Amino acid sequence: MELTIEEMLIKQKETGAHYTPTDLGDIIAKRLINELKKSGISGTKKIRGLDPSCGDGELLLSLNRMGKFNNIDNIELIGIDEDKEAIKEADFRLNEMGINDAKLSGGDFLDMVDLEGNLSLFDDDLSKIEPVDLIIANPPYVRTQVLGADRAQKLAKLFNLKGRVDLYHAFLVAMTLQLKPGGLIGVITSNKYLANTTGESIRQFLAENYDIIEIMDLGDTKLFSGAVLQAIFFGTKKLNKGIRQTAPANFYKIYEETDPSKTEVSIKFETLFGLLESSNTGVFNVDEKFYSVSCGKLIVPDSFKEPWVMATDEEYNWITNINNNSYCTIQDLCDLKVGIKTTADKVFIKSTWEELPDEIKPEVEVLKLLISTDHASKWRPLERIGNQKILYTHENLNGKKKAIHFTQYPHALAYLETHRETLEGRKYVIKAKRNWYQIWLPQNPDHWALPKILFPDISPEPKFFYEDEGCCIDGNCYWIIPKEENNNDILFLILGISNTKYMTNYHDIAFNNKLYPGRTRYLTQYVSNYPLPNPEANYSQEIIDVLRELLFQNPNDERKIEIENQIENLTALAFGVERL
């Protein structure tokens, strides 16, 4: 029975199945075959190649095709997938190409792996199968919230996973167990582990278990129908986990380019897949879309907490120069916080409170102005906040944040009672032993009155802006306040530097986290590590002075452009780098 488009999308979300394009499969297979030839084992005994989530067999076909092209015809193909219909399709396609000896099995690969080391892929006479020589895979990517807490916890315990568990984490561990020491792997993953805090355990696992050959960050090329940005990991399983890799790993990084000054000097390239196979760097025009490509050596810091940096020698020297000339990072002088998350915005956030009947119109004392990513703009918010307000359920008593007893605000309580069923439906609130009417993630109300810097969590360009009107902050924004009270100067310095081309360039190189389409994720884990010059230095003081003029003296457009250019120049001087 054919699935409707809606049913297919639901299945993709639940299973994480996004089949690999043929050309991309060929690129991965060709790279693995080339590494096989380098290893010297390609012409000896039979080579077992496994795809543990083979779907309709695309990657197995690529592996066979690239092997034959390189005169390697001793690869035994092994495919597993829990989708029985996909296995039938894979069997048909392989047989159609004259491949009659492939071993295909319907089942969950994660259930087939013996974690004690006696690995068996099938329940028949192949139960004694040895680990494989080669793995080519596009394992399912299913986020924790879709996977479900129970299965996520089970997988975490079973495969000794830490942090937020996605399904491909478990596949990485299971595939590594199934791979021979010295065996090769080419696997498509999310690229999030390269730079995210949540990727620490994956970075550690890969670095400890593999000599990394190359990582290809596919960026926002949209080669798959899913929204997840992909990377391809190539590695050789270590013979000894205790030996640290000494040979440098390579990287290839491709992202859509939107800067007109760069696209006007682009080089025409016929196909995106052809571009992926090349080692060319620069800006390329493929079907009227522009892509920036860089290649170089992967930087793997000693600490797995730090992101893996994919930078050319020139880029690496540039950020190293900035780091060496910095005084501290933002987190050394300031606290960074996430905005409010109510988990029931339709109940708590409105611009129409005044239109409610008097008996359920909340008292003004509990209605607070709200600012969100909709107001985000460089320097100052786009508008003077507007009428959107939040019914705030917390107050500060004796220096502690506490839920309000709404008996003192009868109209607000009456309003909340009209939505009691909805609010009590948030079982996690009740499970956390909180009052049914509370917003999920509040902040200390005393902090709202403080001057602060805000920035949206996702934006195509930096939009750090100053707020001093005592607003509450929505959960789609982050905010910065000084650790030392009344130290507004440090806010002006941070505001100036964070909005420059220099910090945008630093962010792109050091944290490498572009989203679709050309948008950047401004998480606190990144922004907190922005470098700062000495706040007392002359260049810093000049930045602070011109920021005051920009914020409080309402300069005309011409003067505003002059100030922004001044800030760019002063930032370059403060960090000892050339003007971008």
UniProtKB/Swiss-Prot annotation:
EC number: 2.1.1.72
Superkingdom to which the source organism belongs: Bacteria
Keywords on record: DNA-binding, Methyltransferase, Restriction system, S-adenosyl-L-methionine, Transferase
Keyword Calcium set for record: no
EC class: transferase
PROSITE patterns the record matches: N6_MTASE
Reaction it catalyzes: a 2'-deoxyadenosine in DNA + S-adenosyl-L-methionine = an N(6)-methyl-2'-deoxyadenosine in DNA + S-adenosyl-L-homocysteine + H(+)
Coiled-coil stretches: none
InterPro entries, per the entry: DNA_methylase_N6_adenine_CS (IPR002052), MethylTrfase_TaqI-like_dom (IPR011639), N4_N6_ade-DNA_methylase (IPR050953), SAM-dependent_MTases_sf (IPR029063), TaqI_C (IPR025931)
GO biological process: DNA restriction-modification system; methylation
GO MF terms, alphabetically ordered: DNA binding; site-specific DNA-methyltransferase (adenine-specific) activity
Family, as annotated: Belongs to the N(4)/N(6)-methyltransferase family.
Other facts: The protein sequnce was determined following expression in E.coli.
Stated name of the protein: Type II methyltransferase M.BanIII
